[in-house]
């Protein structure tokens, strides 16, 4: 079932805020209206009685009351209470299929013309339907960046026309293709302007020394069904070189949009403008760097040679001008950009209606699939845009998409299939009355469509009884005009029947000019004359009422603005316009400002109060309560659904799974695209140590597109002993390696030390000397004596 508690809660808050003001208060009589026209402006429920003898002669305001009260008090058929209405002037039925021919009148939106008559404050509601018909003609203009960095891309698209036409003719029988190219403005600092670079800006560039002179934009091939012409034109092209990184592509986009005759856009065809580049664009005010101070005029400036002649004369176009001209000519812009610039161009899509962005491979090999994806994305959604909306008109939208659920405050449907019909309920309300006999015309147009609904608005701000006015009527004593049951007295006359002249002494009846005993005459803001108050004029506004007790300038203000500019001041109290509440009408009941891109109100973590999210989930914060570190994330929430489906073999009709997956649109796949920029990737570990992956995309309807793997990814479980041996072996190997390294280092060190020792030893030189402390082991002593034995003598040494 759809998620609606947040908007419902916001509406209940608005009603609760209004109840204290409405209880016991008759907004019609409290407004002190003194004419039929003033009465009708107070509130759409107020009515005026034009019966001559109705009510108290002194109480003019009693004529302005609720219709039921007027009837109860005796005013029968003379009640003025017009209501808003509309009348369908032209309503051709929706086509079911295009003929594939531009000559066929294909209707994708109905009705086509409506006349609306509005009473201020009174809403009127009508329905319109939009359908993307089958086999609708397609015009595709390929706009390519031919700066030097795109050379490999140019080489890869030389046969693009044939392949692209084959794929597109599977979607439509009437397809035409055109081609244009751009670089940048041929002035400094955007391009090389030195004389040596005039004919070849690539001089001195080693990788690619030859290229053509720089240029702004060239329209090379008008839209044609001859794909050979496209291929031939692409083969002729050569790249150029500019000086700075940004390119002048937005100049080219604008010219391709506004030069309708040159490009050849057909009236009855889907217009696709494919913009391919690998860098960021120049935008408005960048041209001042080159001395270009004239803003872009939004006009076509292609000469007979189909070259952009104002490139060096005007600044780059702004995003606002670009969006206006693309919408004006029903052109869907497709940004085909490299991945590193994806987010920049993604932000551009939020500022330029009808724009999509796709990631282009570095060599443009995926360009055909990219275009097909963008085409399917464009054809799967319908978004209403408003053209020339009058300032005093409020519009409210409610979308009913393919699921049959109504989404208040939304004017876009996504996820449509070709042939689906999207319905929109449009409510109009006038806030005030413009000058008399004013008629406004505005248009409702689906973005990128030729079809539109023209709405003519007239304002019901006069009373029917005003037609029968009686100048100098006898009912007014010949001194005033009788109109709608009252006398409008001529200057100098007063009284309900103009029976008194201004200045007559009526002091005896002065108490009739006091609101209560003891209070000042006419509340101190008027003179009592002819038994009634004549209120003073004030520079701040109007003073009125039977006792001059009311004014239209003493109400609450917000930032110095009376009733915040969203209401009317009546007798000291703000009467808020539809869509606003509060004492000073500063609180908007519009919940669209609280709706995120996924269609959820305050991320379902709070309620919308006065156009701002009030976060109620503990820990939630942010403009849309989108940040919540302590909240269960969407992956955890959707995991229950996925696990239930796995348990029950993917059958969502199981009662438990149906409850858990009631807001999910399930798609089973064999492989998950992990780099999808639009989807959120979730994964978790199962009980069997497998990894289960899924992605989800939140839809504006409150549901989610859930893409789930058919089977969890499970690897082969390794043997425990294998793991143990591997770990032990690794430790031993690391230890042995460390020991070997240590031994090697020690050996190297020892060898160096030994070599050093040997070197020093070889260089050493010593003298021969004896150690004085050294004694030889053999000593010789000489004894001088004579030995006589046996009459022999001996004279020698003894050892």
Curated annotation (Swiss-Prot):
Domain of life per record: Eukaryota
Residue numbers binding Ca(2+) 1: 149, 152-153, 362
UniProt xrefs under SUPFAM superfamilies: EGF/Laminin, Integrin beta tail domain, Integrin domains, Plexin repeat, vWA-like
Sequence ranges on the Cytoplasmic membrane side: 743-799
Positions in the Extracellular compartment: 24-719
VWFA domain span: 136-378
Topology of this chain in the membrane: Single-pass type I membrane protein
Domain PSI stretches: 27-76
Domain I-EGF: 465-499, 500-549, 550-586, 587-626
Keyword annotations from UniProtKB, A to Z: Calcium, Cell adhesion, Cell membrane, Disulfide bond, EGF-like domain, Glycoprotein, Host cell receptor for virus entry, Host-virus interaction, Integrin, Magnesium, Membrane, Metal-binding, Phosphoprotein, Receptor, Repeat, Signal, Transmembrane, Transmembrane helix
Record flagged with keyword Calcium: yes
Residues binding Mg(2+), per UniProt: 147, 149, 247
GO MF: integrin binding; metal ion binding; virus receptor activity
Signal peptide: 1-23
Modified residues (Phosphoserine): 770
Subcellular location field: Cell membrane
Cystine bridges: 28-46, 36-463, 39-64, 49-75, 202-211, 259-300, 401-413, 433-461, 465-484, 476-487, 489-498, 500-530, 513-528, 522-533, 535-548, 550-571, 555-569, 563-574, 576-585, 587-610, 594-608, 602-613, 615-625, 628-631, 635-682, 641-661, 644-657, 690-714
One GO CC annotation: integrin complex
InterPro entries, alphabetized: I-EGF_1 (IPR040622), Integrin_beta_N (IPR033760), Integrin_bsu (IPR015812), Integrin_bsu_cyt_dom (IPR014836), Integrin_bsu_tail (IPR012896), Integrin_bsu_tail_dom_sf (IPR036349), Integrin_bsu_VWA (IPR002369), Integrin_dom_sf (IPR032695)
Glycan-bearing residues: 347, 460, 477, 505, 552, 586, 654, 705
Keyword ATP-binding attached: no
Residue numbers binding Ca(2+) 2: 184, 242, 244, 246-247
Family designation: Belongs to the integrin beta chain family.
The record's note on its domains: The VWFA domain (or beta I domain) contains three cation-binding sites: the ligand-associated metal ion-binding site (LIMBS or SyMBS), the metal ion-dependent adhesion site (MIDAS), and the adjacent MIDAS site (ADMIDAS). This domain is also part of the ligand-binding site.
Subunit structure: Heterodimer of an alpha and a beta subunit. Beta-5 (ITGB5) associates with alpha-V (ITGAV). Interacts with MYO10. Interacts with DAB2. Integrin ITGAV:ITGB5 interacts with FBLN5 (via N-terminus). ITGAV:ITGB5 interacts with CCN3. Interacts with tensin TNS3; TNS3 also interacts with PEAK1, thus acting as an adapter molecule to bridge the association of PEAK1 with ITGB5.
Name of the protein in question: Integrin beta-5
Species, as recorded: Homo sapiens
Gene: ITGB5
């Amino acid at each position: 079932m759809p998620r609606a508690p947040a908007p419902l809660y916001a509406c209940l808050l608005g009603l609760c805020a209004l109840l204290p003001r409405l209880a016991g208060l008759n907004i019609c009589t409290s407004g002190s209206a003194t004419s039929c026209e003033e009465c009708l402006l107070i509130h759409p429920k107020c009515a005026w009685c034009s019966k001559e003898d109705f009510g108290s002669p002194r109480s003019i305001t009693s004529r302005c009351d609720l219709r039921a009260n007027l009837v109860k008090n005796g005013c029968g058929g003379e009640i003025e209470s017009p209501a808003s209405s509309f009348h369908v002037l032209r309503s051709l039925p929706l086509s079911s299929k295009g003929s594939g021919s531009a000559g066929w009148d294909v209707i994708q939106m109905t009705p086509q013309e409506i006349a609306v008559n509005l009473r201020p404050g009174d809403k009127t509601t009508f329905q319109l339907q939009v359908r993307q018909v089958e086999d609708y003609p397609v015009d595709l203009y390929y706009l390519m960046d031919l700066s030097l960095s795109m050379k490999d891309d140019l080489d890869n698209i030389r046969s693009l026309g044939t392949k692209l036409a084959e794929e597109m003719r599977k979607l439509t029988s009437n397809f035409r293709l055109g081609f244009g190219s751009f670089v940048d403005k041929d002035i400094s600092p955007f391009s090389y302007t030195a004389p040596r670079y005039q004919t070849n800006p690539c001089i001195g560039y080693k990788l690619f020394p030859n290229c053509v002179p720089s240029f702004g934009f060239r329209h090379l091939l008008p839209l044609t069904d001859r794909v050979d012409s496209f291929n031939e034109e692409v083969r002729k092209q050569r790249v150029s070189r500019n000086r700075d990184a940004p390119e002048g592509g937005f100049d080219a986009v604008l010219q391709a949009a506004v030069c309708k005759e040159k490009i050849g856009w057909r009236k009855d065809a889907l217009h696709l403008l494919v913009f391919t580049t690998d860098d960021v664009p120049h935008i408005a005010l960048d041209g001042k760097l080159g001395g270009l101070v004239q803003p872009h005029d939004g006009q076509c400036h292609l000469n007979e040679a189909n070259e952009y002649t104002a490139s060096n004369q005007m600044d780059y176009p702004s995003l606002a001008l670009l969006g206006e001209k693309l919408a004006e000519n029903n052109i869907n812009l497709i940004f085909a950009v490299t991945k590193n610039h994806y987010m920049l161009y993604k932000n551009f899509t939020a500022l330029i209606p009808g724009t999509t962005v796709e990631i282009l491979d570095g060599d443009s090999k995926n360009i055909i699939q990219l275009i097909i994806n963008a085409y399917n994305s464009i054809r799967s959604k319908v978004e209403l845009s408003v053209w020339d909306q009058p300032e005093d008109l409020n519009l409210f939208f409610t979308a009913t998409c393919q699921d049959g659920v109504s989404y208040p405050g939304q004017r876009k449907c996504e996820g449509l299939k070709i042939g689906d019909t999207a319905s929109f309920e449009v409510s109009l309300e006038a806030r005030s009355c413009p000058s008399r006999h004013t008629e406004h015309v505005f248009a409702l147009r689906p973005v990128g469509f030729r079809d539109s609904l023209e709405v003519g608005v007239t304002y019901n701000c006069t009373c029917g009884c005003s037609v029968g006015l009686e100048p100098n009527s006898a009912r007014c004593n010949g001194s005033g005009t009788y109109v709608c049951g009252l006398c409008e007295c001529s200057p100098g006359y007063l009284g309900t029947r103009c029976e008194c002249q201004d200045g007559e002494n009526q002091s005896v009846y002065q108490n009739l000019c006091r609101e209560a005993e003891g209070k000042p005459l006419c509340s101190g803001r008027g003179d009592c004359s002819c038994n009634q108050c004549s209120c003073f004029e004030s520079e701040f506004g109007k003073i009125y009422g039977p006792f001059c007790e009311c004014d239209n300038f003493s109400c609450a203000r917000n930032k110095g603005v009376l009733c915040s500019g969203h209401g009317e001041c009546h007798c000291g109290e703000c009467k808020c316009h539809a869509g606003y509440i509060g004492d000073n009408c500063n609180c908007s009941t519009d919940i669209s400002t609280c709706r995120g891109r996924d269609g959820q109100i305050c991320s379902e973590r709070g309620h919308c109060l006065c156009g701002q999210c009030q976060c109620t989930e503990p820990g939630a914060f942010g403009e849309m309560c989108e940040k919540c570190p302590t909240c269960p994330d969407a992956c955890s929430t959707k995991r229950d659904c996925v696990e239930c489906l796995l348990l029950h073999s993917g059958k969502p009709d199981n009662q438990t799974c149906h409850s858990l997956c009631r807001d999910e649109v399930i798609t089973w796949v064999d492989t998950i695209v992990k780099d999808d920029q639009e989807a959120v990737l979730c994964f978790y570990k199962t009980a069997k140590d497998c990894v289960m992956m899924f992605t989800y995309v939140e839809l504006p309807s409150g549901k989610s597109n859930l893409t789930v793997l058919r089977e969890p990814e499970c690897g082969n479980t390794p043997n425990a002993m294998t793991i143990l041996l591997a770990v032990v072996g690794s430790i031993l190997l690391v230890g042995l390696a460390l020991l070997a390294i240590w031994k090697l280092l020690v050996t190297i060190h020892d060898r160096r030390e030994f070599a050093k020792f040997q070197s020093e030893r070889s260089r050493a030189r010593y003298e021969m000397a004896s150690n004085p402390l050294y004694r030889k082991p053999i000593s010789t002593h000489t004894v001088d004596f004579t030995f006589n034995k046996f009459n022999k003598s001996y004279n020698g040494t003894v050892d």
